[in-house]
From Swiss-Prot:
Pfam families: CS_DNAAF11_C, LRR_9. Residues 187-202, 265-283, 407-430 have a biased composition (Basic and acidic residues). Residues 305-406 form the CS domain. This is Dynein axonemal assembly factor 11. Involved in dynein arm assembly, is important for expression and transporting outer dynein arm (ODA) proteins from the cytoplasm to the cilia. Acts as a crucial component in the formation and motility of spermatozoal flagella. Residues 177-202 form a coiled coil. Belongs to the tilB family. It comes from the Eukaryota. It comes from Bos taurus.
């Protein structure tokens, strides 16, 4: 049974920021509501109310909606127009396709002086002889009836024939009430028959269940050990048999002819609810429970697990003597949903309850490890120092040598020349014995005579000028 709750109204009040006390428009159609309640207390400022395609059997609890202008109750189980006198601002009322057989109940709308439009098509009263004339004459404030404008001449004729038309309407109402009483009795009888059939079926299945229990008690012990293998097959067969029976019952229900009455609509709703519950029950049985993820074997060996299916990179930083894990965690995920646990031989990261575990290539120090998260990519970086320290010598840095264009040319020319294995005699390391004693003695530089300047014989026109000092 669908009920009007505060949560239901709030979910349909998103256009008003889920505030219900100031709502002016509310739509509760197709919610399987069977009773009107709470709306007049929670939403007193309503102007438009949609309640079509439900199972409402009576108009009630709307008398406090003074500002209500449009009320839609089409496709419901309403049999009488009532309790609308308090809706002072009502201008449009839609009661299409209901079960209104008491046409005289429209007299309760005479106090709604602002009512301009009324829809009663699809109701049993709309088939009465003189239906339109009676409504037009009774509700003189109406401008439209069933989408057709009421003309002045039509109202004058209806008022003239009102006593005769009213008498005919009363006779047809009595005939409809008798027919309706028979329909109710027939529906009650069918309901009792179905309940008795259901009780018989339950008792039959209960006896069958006891028989299976007795049979299982007489089985040998070695069969009991195989019970866990046979049970799923038996259960699957029972589920299939139940599905087949339910399918047959469903076909029988939908193929069975029935009258269009409020009881038949309620019966259809109950049948659909039962189908939905059975389907949910079967789906729960078929649903396989996942076994818990094994992270460590029985012998204490850790396993590699990546249940969240995240990309990762594991680097061995020899320079800093540590292992770095870069885990591609979702960028906009809250850090509180991540839990890191570093062990000497493996690292475990819980991402939203899903484990990521990786075995490390070397033993690390859990106390010295740390984790940080990138603010740009959201990746999680875990740095884990190794246990064994490695001493690495510092490498001398070579000074940069400036290169000149001449040196580069010399290097290219040297590379182009052919290198031979002959040794230059001037670069020998063996001393020259012949030149140990010098024959000529070197005179001091001051004692040495100045060289004479001899004019060049090659130039015949040379004339020596004594005034010019020698160029030494």
């Amino acid at each position: 049974m669908g009920r009007i709750t505060e949560d239901l109204i709030r979910r349909n009040a998103e256009h008003n920021d889920c505030v219900i006390f100031s709502l002016e428009e509310l739509s509760l159609h197709q919610q399987e509501i069977e009773r009107l309640e709470h709306i007049d207390k929670w939403c007193r400022d309503l102007k438009i109310l949609y309640l079509q395609n439900n199972l409402i059997g009576k108009i009630e609890n709307v008398s406090k909606l003074k500002k209500l202008e449009y009320l839609n109750l089409a496709l419901n189980n309403i049999e009488k127009i009532e309790n609308l006198e308090g809706c002072e601002g009502l201008t449009k009322l839609d009661l299409t396709v209901n079960f209104i057989g008491e046409l005289s109940s429209v007299k309760t709308l005479q106090g709604n002086i602002h009512l301009k439009e009324l829809f009663l098509m699809g109701n049993p009263c709309a088939d009465f002889d003189g239906y339109r004339q009676f409504v037009v004459a009774t509700l003189q404030q109406l401008k439209w009836l069933d989408g057709k404008e009421i003309e002045r001449s039509e109202r004058i004729q209806a008022l003239q024939n009102l006593p005769v038309v009213e008498q005919r309407i009363r006779e047809q109402e009595k005939a409809y009430c008798l027919k309706r009483a028979k329909d109710k009795e027939e529906a009650q009888r069918k309901l009792e028959e179905e309940e008795s059939k259901g009780e018989m079926g339950r008792s039959h299945t209960g006896s069958g269940g006891h028989w299976h229990a007795d049979l299982s008690a007489t089985l040998p012990s070695f069969e009991e050990s195989k019970d866990y293998i046979q049970a799923p097959e038996i259960e699957e067969g029972q589920c299939k048999g139940k599905e087949f029976d339910d399918r047959e019952d469903d076909l029988e229900f939908w193929n069975k002819p029935s009258l269009y009455t409020p009881e038949s609509r309620l019966e259809t709703l109950r049948h659909m609810e039962k189908q939905r519950r059975d389907q949910e029950r079967l789906s729960e049985k078929k649903k396989k429970v996942k076994p818990p993820r094994m992270l460590v074997t029985e012998d204490g060996r850790a396993l590699n697990v990546n249940e969240p299916k995240l990309d990762f990179t594991l680097k061995d930083d020899e320079k800093r003597n540590q292992i770095v894990l870069d885990l591609a965690v979702y960028r906009y995920m809250d850090t509180s949903l991540i839990d890191v646990d570093v062990q000497p031989t493996y690292v475990r990261v819980m991402v939203k309850g899903k484990p990521f575990q990786l075995i490390l290539p070397a033993e690390v120090k859990p106390d010295s490890s740390f984790a940080k998260r990138s603010q740009t990519t959201g990746h999680l970086v875990v740095c884990m120092p190794k246990v064994g320290e490695v001493i690495i010598g510092c490498q001398r840095t070579s000074k940069p040598v400036k290169s000149t264009p001449d040196s580069s040319k010399e290097q290219t020319s040297k590379s182009q020349q052919m290198e031979r294995l002959e040794v230059d005699p001037s670069k020998r390391s063996i001393p020259d014995v012949a030149n140990i004693v010098q024959e000529k003695k070197h005179m001091p530089r001051r004692v040495c005579a100045e060289p004479k300047i001899i004019p060049s014989e090659e130039d015949p026109d040379f004339e020596d000028n004594p005034e010019v000092p020698p160029l030494i």
